[in-house]
Design a protein with these regions (language model features):
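Active-site and substrate-binding clefts of carbohydrate-active enzymes
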Residues: 32-63, 70-72, 191-194, 202-203, ...
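CE4/NodB-like, metal-dependent polysaccharide N-deacetylase domain
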Residues: 126-155, 199, 230-246
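Short, well-structured secondary-structure segments
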Residues: 34-125, 131-135, 149-153, 172-178, ...
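Alpha-amylase-like alpha-glycosidases and glucanotransferases acting on alpha-linked glucans and related
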Residues: 184-232
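N-terminal export leaders
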Residues: 5-9, 13
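Catalytic domains of cell-wall/extracellular-matrix polysaccharide-remodeling enzymes
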Residues: 134-190, 248-268
Length: 314
C-alpha cells in the first residue's frame, strides 16, 4: 500500500512537472486579436435624374457590386438605397435587385433606412421626418420581410432634434462621421464601437465612420487595406467602421476598371475572409452583441469636407 502511494505521488508529480511548462507556454501564446469590419455602402441619385445617367450608374457600379458580393455569402455588409432610386432599379432591373433581396433574407446584407427621397432630416419638420422615414421603412419591410433598425443620414448632417423621429419609426442607430466625435474631444482610438445619445430622454445609438477607411477604400491596394485592418486588430481595436458612397466603386474616375476589371473588390473580399484577424458583420449583429461605449452629445455638424464646402466664399 505504501509503495502504491509512492508510485501515485511520483506519477502526480511527474504529471504536474510535465504539464507546468505546457501551461506556461499556453499562457505565453497570445490569443489572436480580431477586428470586426462593419462595411456599408450608400446609393442615391437625385430625384428626377436623367434615366441614362442612372442606367450608367447601374451598369458600372450597382450591378457589378451586387453580383460580386452575392458570390461571397460569408462576407456581411450593409447597404442603403434611397427610396426613389430603389423603386427605379426594381422596376427596370428586377433580377439584379432580387439578388439584393436574397442577400438580405439570408442574413448577408442589412438594409438601412432613411428619408424616402433623401431629405436632410434636420432641415424638415418633425411630421415630415416621420413620414419620410416610415415610407422607406414600410417599403423595405414589404420587399424583404426585414424591418430596418439602422438609418443613413443624408450628407451625415447631425442635429439632435432628429432623434425623436428616428426612434419613433423604429430606428435604433445611425452612422455619422468620426469628425462629429472629434468635435466633442473623443480620440480616434476610442471610436471602434457605438455610442449612445438622447433627446428629451429618447435614446439613439451612433456609429462613428472612419475617415481613414473612407480615404483607403477603394483607392489603396487591397493588400494594403487588409494590412491596415490587421494592424488595427493587433492594437486591440474592436471594430473598423465604414459607410460611404457606393458610387466610389465604379462611377468615380478610373474606379470601374480598378474595382472590377483589375479585381480590387474580389481581392479585398477574399483577403478579408482569409484573414484570421478580420471578421465581417452587419451593424445589427454588432449592435446586438456589443455594449455602448457611453453617452455622447454631438454638436450640429456634418462631415469635415461638407463643413468646408458650406463656408462662404472669400
Amino acid at each position: 500500500m505504501r509503495e502504491q502511494r509512492r508510485c501515485l505521488l511520483a506519477s502526480t508529480c511527474l504529471s504536474s512537472a510535465f504539464l507546468r511548462p505546457l501551461r506556461a507556454a499556453a499562457l505565453k501564446t497570445p490569443m489572436t486579436q480580431t477586428i470586426t469590419l462593419l462595411l456599408g455602402v450608400h446609393a442615391h441619385q437625385p430625384v428626377g435624374n436623367f434615366p441614362e445617367v442612372i442606367e450608367d450608374a447601374h451598369q458600372r457600379c450597382y450591378k457589378p457590386f451586387l453580383h460580386t458580393l452575392h458570390a461571397y455569402p460569408d462576407f456581411r455588409f450593409a447597404a442603403h438605397f434611397s427610396g426613389w432610386l430603389l423603386d427605379w432599379l426594381r422596376e427596370r432591373h428586377p433580377a439584379d435587385m432580387a439578388l439584393l433581396a436574397e442577400m438580405v433574407r439570408r442574413g448577408q446584407v442589412e438594409l438601412f433606412s432613411s428619408g424616402d427621397t433623401e431629405p436632410v432630416l434636420a432641415a424638415i419638420p418633425h411630421r415630415d421626418r416621420i413620414g419620410q422615414l416610415q415610407t422607406l421603412n414600410d417599403k423595405l419591410t414589404a420587399w424583404t420581410g426585414v424591418q430596418p433598425s439602422g438609418a443613413w443620414l443624408t450628407e451625415r448632417v447631425w442635429e439632435s432634434a432628429v432623434v425623436p423621429a428616428l426612434a419613433a419609426t423604429g430606428i435604433r442607430y445611425v452612422t455619422v462621421d468620426d469628425y462629429h466625435f472629434f468635435c466633442t474631444g473623443q480620440p480616434a482610438t476610442a471610436l471602434d464601437g457605438y455610442f449612445s445619445t438622447e433627446e428629451d430622454g429618447t435614446r439613439l445609438d451612433l456609429f462613428p465612420i472612419s475617415e481613414a477607411l473612407r480615404y483607403r477604400l477603394p483607392f489603396s491596394p487591397a493588400h494594403e487595406v487588409i494590412a491596415y485592418l490587421e494592424g488595427l486588430a493587433e492594437q486591440g481595436q474592436v471594430a473598423a467602421i465604414y459607410f460611404d458612397d457606393i458610387e466610389k466603386f465604379g462611377i468615380w474616375p478610373e474606379t470601374y476598371d480598378w474595382v472590377y476589371h483589375r479585381g480590387w473588390l474580389k481581392a479585398l473580399i477574399e483577403g478579408v475572409l482569409a484573414s484570421p484577424k478580420i471578421r465581417t458583420a452587419t451593424y445589427a449583429d454588432f449592435h446586438a452583441g456589443n455594449a455602448t461605449r457611453g453617452i455622447v452629445y454631438l454638436p450640429t455638424t456634418s462631415y469635415s469636407e461638407m463643413n468646408e464646402w458650406t463656408l462662404p466664399m472669400p
